Amino acid sequence: DGSYRLKDSDTTETLEECLLALREISGESDASITEITAEQYGEAIREYRSLAINFAYAIPYRELCARWEIPRVQGAELVIGADTLAFSQASAQSIFIAERRENKYYRLYSQRDVDLFSVMTEQEDLSKLTACYTVGTILGGENDRLIPLSAESNLVPLRWYEESEETSQDVRRTLAEALFGENFDFVRRITDTFGNVTYMYGYGQKTFTQRVDGVLEYKNETSEGAAGGFFRDLETALSFVSAHGTWDSLDGRELRFFLRDARAVSAGKQEGYRFWFGAKMLDQTIYYESGVPIEIEVLDGQISYYRRDVISVETGGETYGFRPVQDPANVIARNYNHIYNVMTGNMLAVNEESAFEYVAQAVEDIRMGLVRIANDDRLRPAWILATESGQVFYFSLYEATPIGMGK
C-alpha cells in the first residue's frame, strides 16, 4: 500500500541481527561486494518490501568490519563508509550498503539460497510501529523522505535552566583543576567585563572558559601523534566527558545522551573526528536553536576541543494525556511560504504552486521533540523540520505556528 513502518527506539537487537548476517555472508568464500547505482538501490528499497537500518552518521566500513569481526570479502575495498544497511525482497540473498552523504551504494551478494529479508523481519510486529509515507506520496513530487500521516503526543512545555545556575563555584573549579591536572598552579584566571571566566595555561596552549550563559568550552593545542580511528577516538571522547563533566548534568539530574553526528576532521598533519552529542529527557530529544549539548573533537588521539552546553529540566509538573497534534503535512501546507522565503531569501510574492513544490522537495526530515528557544525559559513541544540545505525550522506541535529556526 506504499506505507512504511518507522522504529527509532529499542533497535539494538535489530542491529545485532544485521551485523550477524553481515558477518555470516562475508564469511562465504564466494561472497562479493559490487557497486550499484542510486537508482538501483532506490528501486530495491522503494519498489519492494524492504528493511533499512539508518545511522545518523557514517562509520568507516573497514573499522566496522574489524570491530565486529566481519571478514573482508572481494570488493570490500570499494566501500569507504556506511550509514545504512538494508535488506530487500528484490534480492533476498543480498545486503545493501549505503553511504548516503556521498551518494554511494553497494550490494553484498551471497551465492547461497538464503532469504535474508525474511530472517531480519520475522520477529518484528510491524502493526505496532508508526505508519509513514513518503513526502511525495502525501504532498506530490518525488521526495522519498518519510513522514507520518498523523500523530499524537502528551508533551507539555517544561522549564529549563543552565546547569551553571545550580552548579557551585567549587564544582566548576574542580572541573578546571581536572582539565589542567598538575599544571593548575601555573594557570592564569581571567574574568572579562561580562563575567566570563577563562583559565589559561602558557600562552594559550590550553584554555577553559566558563561563560555566563552556562556554556563551558575547553581548547587544547595537541601534539602530533597517531590517529586513533573512529571507534578509538569515540572511546577517547566518551572517557574524557565521563571524567570532565560526567554524562549527567552537573547538578546530578539524569539526561540520556546519544551520538547525533560524527565527521572526520584534520588539522595540518593531524587527523581525527569531531563528535556531536544530543540529549533526551522523558524519551524526547531536546533540540537547540544553536549548538548541541556536547561537542568534542579528537586529533591524533588527544582532545583538542570540548564544548558543554547541558541544561537541567524540571519534571513532575502539569501533565496531560495523549492528544492529537498537527500532522506533518498540515505543518508544511500552512508554512510553506515562510519556509520558502527563509530558504531562498526571496521575500517577494512568488507562484504558490512553485513555492510549495520547492519546499516539499526540500524536506529532509520531520519529527517531534522539545526545543530550546532563545529568551524562552520553557522547552517547547514542536515539530522539527530539517531541509536538505541544513536549515531547521521549529513549529509548535499543537498549533503548527513558527517558533524558531536554526542550522
List each model region and its residues.
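Preferential activation on post-signal-peptide N-terminal prodomains/segments
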Residues: 1-244
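Short, non-transmembrane alpha-helical segments in secretory-pathway proteins
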Residues: 15-22, 29-30, 170-176, 223-268, ...
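Hydrophobic/aromatic beta-strand positions that recur at structurally equivalent sites within the blades
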Residues: 98, 108-109, 296-298, 395
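A short local loop/turn or secondary-structure capping micro-motif enriched for an aromatic residue
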Residues: 116-117, 312-316, 402-404
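Exposed beta-strand-loop-beta-strand "reactive/processing" segments of non-cytosolic proteins
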Residues: 173-212, 216-220, 249-301, 308, ...
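C-terminal structural cap/anchor segments
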Residues: 270-351
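Short, low-complexity, Pro/Ser/Thr/Gly-rich segments in the mature regions of secreted, periplasmic
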Residues: 391-407
